[in-house]
Amino acid sequence: MAALRLPTPPPPRAPAPWLHSSHRRRVAAPRGAGGGGGGGGAVPPPPVRTLLIDNYDSYTYNIFQELSVVNGVPPVVVRNDEWTWRDVYRWVYKERAFDNIVISPGPGSPACPSDIGIGLRILCECGDIPILGVCLGHQALGFVHGAKIVHAPEAIHGRLSELEHNGCYLFNHIPSGINSGFKVVRYHSLVIEPDSLSEDLISIAWTASPKMLSFLESDKPDITSSTLWGSLDNLFVTNQSECSTTDGKMPSINDASELDGYRVLMGVRHSTRPHYGVQFHPESVATHYGRQIFQNFKKITTDFGLQTPLLQERKVHSIGKLERSQISSPDLKNFVANDLLHSARLKLWDSVGPCALPKRSSGDKCLRLQWKKIDNFLNRIGGSENIFSVLFGHHSAEDTFWLDSSSVDQNRARFSFMGGKGGPLWKQMTFHLASQRANCGGNLTIRDAYGCTVRNFLKDGFLDFLDKEMQSIQYIEKDYEGLPFDFHGGFVGYIGYGLKVECDASSNSAKSSTPDACFFFADNLVVVDHNNGDVYILSLHDEYSSGNGDGDYQNSIHSLWLANTEKKLLRMDAMAPRLSINGNSSINGNSFTISSSVNKQRFVIEKSKDEYIRDVQSCLDYIRDGESYELCLTTQMKRRTDYMDALKLYLKLRKQNPAPYAAWLNFSSENLSICCSSPERFLRLDRNAILEAKPIKGTIARGRTPEEDECLRLQLKYSEKDQAENLMIVDLLRNDLGKVCEPGSVHVPRLMDVESYKTVHTMVSTIRGTKMSDLSPVDCVKAAFPGGSMTGAPKVRSMEILDSLETSPRGIYSGSVGFFSYNKTFDLNIVIRTVVLHNGEASIGAGGAIVALSDPEAEYNEMLLKAKAPTKVVEECSQQIYNPDRSDSMQTTVS
């Protein structure tokens, strides 16, 4: 197939407002050419400006972070369907705004026009611009020059290979061959067939051996294009239907099992153009010499610019003063011109200093905090369970919350937060999406402390509303000096999985029976420090209300609540010998009665074993065709629980399956209780602007003896499959944090640690970064929600595939429970290991990550293992009278 040649590009549009003459510069004048004033010192090299084409991948912002550091200025990110060729021609050739182009990885194949978008035409037309293609971008480079794209001998995702190369400048200062140390991470199912390379392309890198490496270098062994479009009309169609056959599969791609698995092609370059491609992922946290590759590409760019007469006149966009929010917001569709600006611009909020109240705007609040501390108190009264029961456990604990660090082993969590219906500022916010598509808005109901209810339609959705609510709050930092925790009052509740349509997903498969988000505004709360046993009592009031007389009233109400709560706690100290700390006891005398007919109810899994295994196989097929690297498949199990004591169930769950990010939430108006024993943090932002994610990928049951337990722990630690799962999600979370964190700040202090809990061992990693100052807490959540450990990667395509396989909505499961503090911090978990009680029904979600190494039968068993703890607790709470024989059930059940 000959190299493609496209029509002459159209004339450019008018200059964009962000590209002014003051932002342009020409290539530095030759020595001796004169110039402005000066001391004659060396001129620092100009930064390199990169256009980064995003193929809807979940690793693009890892490349963004690397290029920001290497180039000295962040790249401009544009999705592959966001610019037309007219736009590219304008900015690359007329405005001369970019020095080079990088084409990102992504799902699918370059043979499918909508998978690669504008990238193909860029590779065809931009012959005088240095271009680096990564993974899908690499395959696209081969495709436009006639190479065949075929299935790899084996789908490789999250695993490492040693490489050898030919000394090409892209690999300058990088060793080559077996045991050289040049190990790279691979995420791909398709490859360029080496024998199909035209004279235009030169092979520059290959796998050095057939041996695949896991991150810990486990020795476990590893268990074409027949249809290419020949016309421009077919090649550049944008209709998704053009990419599929009647059975919904991608166009035919040859099976490449006959290819040599030993020397898989890992890099190519063009013979005359400065175009390079690498099949592996240099941006991965586990790739060796990844940054060196980007540095070499920068050097290729600068050398090419000096050697090419055409580029001597190239005008390059300077580092200048571009809006940080435009460069680094989660949605970069607002970068270029006013007609492309996203309608929801970020509203920046200036921090309030500790010395004076800010000027008030309409609707603003200035919250002041009062607090008291009781030293070394927790152990004297039998633990945090007794505090919650006495202060908030009455009336079935209606409208209460408890962010419960019920597992504090190994300093995994330190603080618990609890509260109920509070003072004048308390309110409950309940949100339902209007439909299941993006940008649909939804209906919000607000109920205040006095019982008044207001209903509104939110055109821009719940997260936008929450962001504006937080922006309207001012505060005085000195109020919480001395407090060792970040939640000082504010919003506490959950975000359902369906709110993904406000975070880059295009749609939901079905409507959730539970609200899509539900939060309290908590103005009164009690905090427990599990490290030293201290207990804190906190209360908020609105300083701005003093102008109409309400401030003094609020202040007195909150002072009274502080005093009364302190008295109740001290009374508990005096009564400590008589307090029950048995999680099986009833709360405040509430009886626990279940009829025998209810006892006979059983959990029924939404899909049979055969159906679930078929779904796993479908996931493997999608992975093999390059549509995803990892798919987090889930299912739901349900049973009737009409008379279940929800709080009693939670107390039993926290005892049998303690977890650092456990939670209890009750929304009485919705007949909804959430009993969560999650071991996983989704995302946290502390007062030092540090973002942290702690994804879990990899789970195995505890052993019956210490010897068996240690054997199982090591089995998980060295599992190649689980390491691959974990690495993929770590790179995904690095990407999500990279959208909103300062360039160069995203790092991984803990990679693939094994943590042990009461019932399971899990593989956990920690990712951190420093939030950019002009982005809000909600911006950070929108950049990363839903948690990648519950979707897979690439996230957007993976969510679409999962929606097509999962037949019911996830609802609260896979979402997040936690807080948004009034002082602009937050901490959210991943909702797993959770029982949701709603309108007399208990539901539990469970699943697992499907990767190329997955075994369908093992995946089904892992799903059952993850559901075991919560289902066991529900069964125990409902079997005081009747204990059925589970072996005679005709339905798929969990016990």
UniProtKB/Swiss-Prot annotation:
Subcellular location: Plastid, Chloroplast
Region feature (PABB component): 387-875
Disordered as annotated region, ranges: 1-45
Reaction it catalyzes: chorismate + L-glutamine = 4-amino-4-deoxychorismate + L-glutamate
Domain named Glutamine amidotransferase type-1: residues: 49-307
EC number of this enzyme: 2.6.1.85
Keyword terms of this UniProt record: Chloroplast, Folate biosynthesis, Glutamine amidotransferase, Multifunctional enzyme, Plastid, Transferase, Transit peptide
GO biological process, one term: 4-aminobenzoate biosynthetic process
GO cellular component, one term: chloroplast
Molecular function terms from GO: 4-amino-4-deoxychorismate synthase activity
PROSITE patterns xrefs: GATASE_TYPE_1
Function: Bifunctional enzyme that catalyzes the biosynthesis of 4-amino-4-deoxychorismate (ADC) from chorismate and glutamine. In the first step, a glutamine amidotransferase generates ammonia that is channelled between the binding sites of glutamine and chorismate and used along with chorismate in the second step, catalyzed by aminodeoxychorismate synthase, to produce ADC. Required for the synthesis of 4-aminobenzoate (PABA), an important component in tetrahydrofolate biosynthesis. Does not possess ADC lyase activity.
NCBIfam families: pabB
Family per record: In the C-terminal section; belongs to the anthranilate synthase component I family.
Entry's free-text remark on domains: The PABA component provides the glutamine amidotransferase activity. The PABB component catalyzes the formation of ADC by binding chorismate and ammonia.
Full protein name: Probable aminodeoxychorismate synthase, chloroplastic
Organism: Oryza sativa subsp. japonica (Rice)
Name of the coding gene: ADCS
